[in-house]
Amino acid sequence: MEILFSISILALLFSGVVAAPSDDDVFEEVRVGLVVDLSSIQGKILETSFNLALSDFYGINNGYRTRVSVLVRDSQGDPIIALAAATDLLKNAKAEAIVGAQSLQEAKLLATISEKAKVPVISTFLPNTLSLKKYDNFIQWTHDTTSEAKGITSLIQDFSCKSVVVIYEDADDWSESLQILVENFQDKGIYIARSASFAVSSSGENHMMNQLRKLKVSRASVFVVHMSEILVSRLFQCVEKLGLMEEAFAWILTARTMNYLEHFAITRSMQGVIGFKSYIPVSEEVKNFTSRLRKRMGDDTETEHSSVIIGLRAHDIACILANAVEKFSVSGKVEASSNVSADLLDTIRHSRFKGLSGDIQISDNKFISETFEIVNIGREKQRRIGLWSGGSFSQRRQIVWPGRSRKIPRHRVLAEKGEKKVLRVLVTAGNKVPHLVSVRPDPETGVNTVSGFCVEVFKTCIAPFNYELEFIPYRGNNDNLAYLLSTQRDKYDAAVGDITITSNRSLYVDFTLPYTDIGIGILTVKKKSQGMWTFFDPFEKSLWLASGAFFVLTGIVVWLVERSVNPEFQGSWGQQLSMMLWFGFSTIVFAHREKLQKMSSRFLVIVWVFVVLILTSSYSANLTSTKTISRMQLNHQMVFGGSTTSMTAKLGSINAVEAYAQLLRDGTLNHVINEIPYLSILIGNYPNDFVMTDRVTNTNGFGFMFQKGSDLVPKVSREIAKLRSLGMLKDMEKKWFQKLDSLNVHSNTEEVASTNDDDEASKRFTFRELRGLFIIAGAAHVLVLALHLFHTRQEVSRLCTKLQSFYK
């Protein structure tokens, strides 16, 4: 009994010693808020991992004086509720940091409030986006999208691929996080041939199938996918149905997409797909933590890799916060500091340690992790094929592509024949202008003979590249030709003919530089004779009448002024009348010889001769222009207001040179509106019959078609530029268009402007246009008459005074 009593006393004393409070056992508490959607698997993992990590941390570091107290708030997936929860944590609970932000909207709201409260907000869900860089207190603790973008770009360059198709989710956080990748493509010269976006709420199977059919016609063989798990599962079901998981295609998934893909039900339709994943170094600590995390979660994790990534990042965030709190509180700063959050943020930024997810380092408010695992999805599991780190690949292994092929997907390789590659070229065979392109089958052998200006230019441009040409006639519409070339890439490589470069066709194919003059012209018949009264054409009737009236008026005024002092204007009334008319009309040819006595009449004649000089010059110039060029009375806005297709459609099926000429001669057509090459051939054959009176550069000329992304496009374009600079294109035009050097064809904008000016000058002058001259002349006549009447009145007054004095 005494022994039991003694043991009890010792136990009480021992427990008292252990439980007795001391200064060392009083912890300094720092509150941290977790704002997550507790109904989501990511939110549950974050909360569980955070608490488990703190428990492990303080179990090892039980001598630390500080403790991080976790305050959890459920955002319910609503950004507004998340904002309210964060406000409550900062204002009422006095939280010194917040962890959360599962969407871009939440991140922007929490980042805004963190700027005002000067409290750090840490997100483990969102990739780096440009719109969040402006917030100084917002830290993105995810993979480095800049390094990832460089890795994807480098991988595509290894395929020698110059164009890709980008497929992404139509949501703010997904589209924004794609910008860095797009910029890398542009910097490295990778062309985005097509792009498509899909929203979770509106992207059913039919919509996806329609969009993917449009993407299929692009010549790009590499597809980059950036979207959530639910959309990826829908996407690849459609991709498989459309035959886009065959040998000729490559699919690359971004890390944000690939991190959440684990289920076999999803990946079984994705065999051969390549994905970037956040790299997690394998260690016993990682295995131990993830094992305990699954037990805590009750094996409720939906995806293995995603739960590991989120859990390990949450673990490292908890540890770095606990370390940071301890560092600046050793000397009692937690109690003394008035701004714990600012000190905490500064300590986090300068923290360096090795965590479960890798080496921890913060730069520009984002976690730096340049290492990515590259995986290849197989029949049953994912297989690592390499690592991307520090700007280079390592541990590379062979890739098994879609269709179980081990060959790198490329554009269709040209068929080979001996030492030369065969280029299969579609030729427009329905053209009725053989000068441009002509396809004639040999009746005995059946072999097509292809000739014409377009064909000769193409053969000359392609000759340096050692291709054997196989011409295939095509008798359909040129718009359909572009679509055919883009969809039948295994059969055809290029197209040649009178093919105008248009924006619609450029959606399906790539064009070379134009090798013909650009624009549309107006052609009409030259006028042989313009009638016996052509000399009246330069002036309208009103101007002729006004001019005649002023000639007579000038003679009358000069006669009135001069007749009292000048003998040449005196005599009988008949002599005076003839002198008036003679003097007035003789000024037309400046043939007046009479010497004028008074200054006023001389002044009047000088002014009138100036007016006559302008009238005669205008008359001569206008008469000359009407004899030089036959004008077309066209409403240019009506003629050039439509597209090339609508204008040439007015001609129906009339395309042959002879048909044009005959219809113009017999008056069925007054003018022809068509592209410059067609009109050049017509004028070349009949240079004395027709003339081009105007042109507008609203079309892009003829070009050669190639499949999207073809390496031959820049090469052939350079050859076209070389032919033009050497004058060889002009020589070919002379050969096929005949007497081109004698044509009245305008080759540049300045000449067209000059022709327009000549056409305007050939219009009849009206009295309204030259009324300024007659106002000047009229003012001179009125002034001279007024002076004459004033002097006459003085003389009459003096005469009356003399008569009055005589009678007196």
UniProtKB/Swiss-Prot annotation:
Main localization (coarse): membrane
The UniProt record lists the keyword Cell cycle: no
Single GO MF annotation: calcium channel activity
Signal peptide: 1-19
Extracellular side: 20-541, 624-771
Residues annotated as glycosylated: N288, N339, N504
Protein name, per record: Glutamate receptor 1.1
Source organism (scientific name): Arabidopsis thaliana
Gene name for this UniProt entry: GLR1.1
